[in-house]
Every structure is written in structure tokens, then in C-alpha cells.
């Protein structure tokens, strides 16, 4: 039987620790290792953990989620790892559902997940990862369906092979890690069950939409260097989605940066229904001239 580890980075998580302890105790079967690390909290996270009987190792200065998760991996010996944030929730049957797929030909097992509002418990997002897509086209899946951290059960050796999480950016580092797994040849499977839930509130980094859009653009600029094996059309679609988000947040210089990236990838201008059409009416005049030129050139090429 494969050995397993539940890895939990904590940052100002004092209020969530009682529920986290209940989540851990309810697991059946249980993980072989449960490792909690504190990423420079300014509240009583470490002390409250001790009061509850949870061992939380302080890491010192706050370095962000990617660095904290990488630190937790270095402290475990298990063959398979699952990341959970201190304010996340995990189904008691988690291991029962994912362990049957951990054979010699698999490196990552995904599960469906949900995001819910902390106050209302209303479902905000459903993350679904079709097994067939992830078996056949994991790179496309990772670009089009960014995988959240709590969705995956990962072979530690494969995680170590890619160098773990990016520690420079504090948003989209989870989607980036899973894409790099796919690019490294990791073999994926997925179960349809909702096994993990993320509690959403305004205090986390993901609540800063502008910062997250900028992180996504930074990652996409890096991925443009890997086309192929990443399909340029998939990248263009993600770039335009990001450009639309940046426009909504008012970062017009980043919008310009995103559109230039799309052009370098071969974008010919937005079609009806394309994400880019949402921002076309708001582009400055030089961009409108550029779009008109592209359309004219495309028509000439067809003649």
C-alpha cells in the first residue's frame, strides 16, 4: 500500500484550526503523515495549534504559499502527497476514493472540488476534471482548466522532479505546478467525486483579482516559450481571458501587454463570441488600427 502525506501550510489560520482538526480526525482511512507548517503568521496560529494538539512547525518569515508547500514536502517521507490549506475542507473518504488509482502508471489523481462562500456557504465555483481529457490531453487540460492545489494527489517523486511550486508568484502557482507536471510527462487520472472544498473570503491572495490576473499573465508569457508542445490556440484563449480580466480591473498597460503577447502567438483579432471581443470597444485608437490592419491582411491572404 502506498504511503501518504497530508501537507497543510498555515498563515494567520488561528480561527480555522478547530475545524481543521475535526477534518483530520474524520478521515477514514487516515494519512500516514500530517504535516503543518506556519508561514510567518502574525496571529496565534502556532500556539492555538499546540492547544488543540496539532504540531505546527514555524518557518519564520512569510514567504508565500508556494514556498510553504515546498517546505512541507521536504519534511515528509511519503510516496504520495496531498495539499490542503488550513481553511479548506476534505471528505472523510478522500483516500478511499483516490488510492485505487495510484498504480505504477499514474503520477497524479485529480478530484472534483468546490469553492464556497465563508459566510453563506453558497457554492461559488465547481472544479471538474474529466478523466478522459486528463488521460489523453493533460497539457491542454492544464492550460484550459487550471488545476487548484486541493484537487490533486501527487506522486512525490514526480513533484520533486519538476522542482515543486513556483515561489515567486502567490497566485496561479497551483495551475502552473500542474502544467509543469503535464509538460514533464506526468500521467493523470481523475475521479468525479467532490472531495475537497475551499472556503472563500476576502482575506486571501485570491481575493486580489488584479494581482492574480497579473500573475496569470506572467505565467502565460513564460508558457509562450513552450509552444509547442503547448498549443498556441489554447494559449491565445487564456491570454484573451486574462486581458479581459485586466481590463475590468483597470490595468490598461497590462491589457496592452497581453494583446501584444496574443499577436506574437498568432492572434488574428477576435471573432464573435471570443473573450477578446469584450474589450475591443475600449481599446485605444492605435490598437483599433492594428486590428483593422490584421483583418485586412487576413482577407488578402485568403484571395
Name each region found by the language model.
Residues 12-26:
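Short, well-formed alpha-helical segments that are part of the catalytic scaffolds
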Residues 38-46, 61, 85:
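A conserved acidic beta->alpha catalytic loop
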Residues 59-76:
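Glycine-rich, basic loop-to-helix element that forms the pyrophosphate-binding segment
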Residues 81:
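Short aromatic/hydrophobic "clamp" motif used to bind/position activated sugar donors
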Residues 186, 194-202, 206-233, 253-265:
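Catalytic core of nucleotide-sugar-dependent glycosyltransferases
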Residues 93-124:
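Conserved donor NDP-sugar-binding/catalytic core segment of glycosyltransferases
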Residues 170-179:
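Acidic donor-binding loop at a coil-to-helix junction in glycosyltransferase catalytic cores
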Residues 112, 126-145, 149:
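Short, flexible, basic/aromatic active-site loop/helix in glycosyltransferases
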Amino acid at each position: 500500500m502506498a504511503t501518504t502525506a497530508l501537507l497543510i501550510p498555515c498563515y494567520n489560520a488561528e480561527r480555522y484550526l478547530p475545524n481543521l482538526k475535526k477534518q483530520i480526525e474524520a478521515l477514514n482511512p487516515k494519512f500516514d503523515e500530517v504535516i503543518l507548517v506556519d508561514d510567518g503568521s502574525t496571529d496565534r496560529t502556532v500556539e492555538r495549534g499546540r492547544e488543540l494538539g496539532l504540531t505546527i512547525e514555524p518557518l519564520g518569515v512569510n514567504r508565500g504559499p508556494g514556498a510553504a508547500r515546498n517546505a512541507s514536502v521536504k519534511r515528509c517521507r511519503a510516496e504520495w502527497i496531498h495539499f490542503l490549506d488550513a481553511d479548506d475542507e476534505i471528505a472523510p473518504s478522500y483516500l478511499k476514493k483516490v488510492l485505487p488509482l495510484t498504480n505504477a502508471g499514474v503520477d497524479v489523481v485529480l478530484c472534483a472540488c468546490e469553492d464556497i462562500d465563508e459566510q453563506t456557504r453558497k457554492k461559488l465555483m465547481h472544479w471538474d476534471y474529466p478523466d478522459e481529457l486528463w488521460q489523453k490531453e493533460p497539457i491542454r487540460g492544464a492550460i484550459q482548466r487550471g488545476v487548484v492545489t486541493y484537487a490533486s494527489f501527487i506522486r512525490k517523486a514526480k513533484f520533486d522532479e519538476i522542482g515543486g511550486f513556483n515561489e515567486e508568484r502567490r497566485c496561479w502557482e497551483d495551475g502552473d505546478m500542474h502544467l509543469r507536471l503535464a509538460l514533464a510527462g506526468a500521467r493523470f487520472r481523475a475521479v468525479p467525486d467532490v472531495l475537497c472544498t475551499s472556503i472563500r473570503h476576502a482575506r486571501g491572495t485570491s481575493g486580489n483579482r488584479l494581482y492574480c490576473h497579473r500573475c496569470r499573465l506572467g505565467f502565460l508569457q513564460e508558457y509562450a516559450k513552450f509552444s509547442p508542445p503547448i498549443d498556441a490556440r489554447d494559449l491565445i484563449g487564456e491570454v484573451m481571458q486574462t486581458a479581459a480580466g485586466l481590463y475590468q480591473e483597470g490595468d490598461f498597460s497590462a491589457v496592452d501587454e497581453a494583446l501584444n503577447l496574443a499577436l506574437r502567438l498568432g492572434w488574428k483579432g477576435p471573432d464573435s463570441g471570443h473573450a477578446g471581443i469584450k474589450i475591443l470597444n475600449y481599446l485605444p485608437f492605435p490598437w483599433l488600427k492594428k486590428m483593422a490592419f490584421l483583418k485586412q491582411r487576413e482577407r488578402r491572404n485568403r484571395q
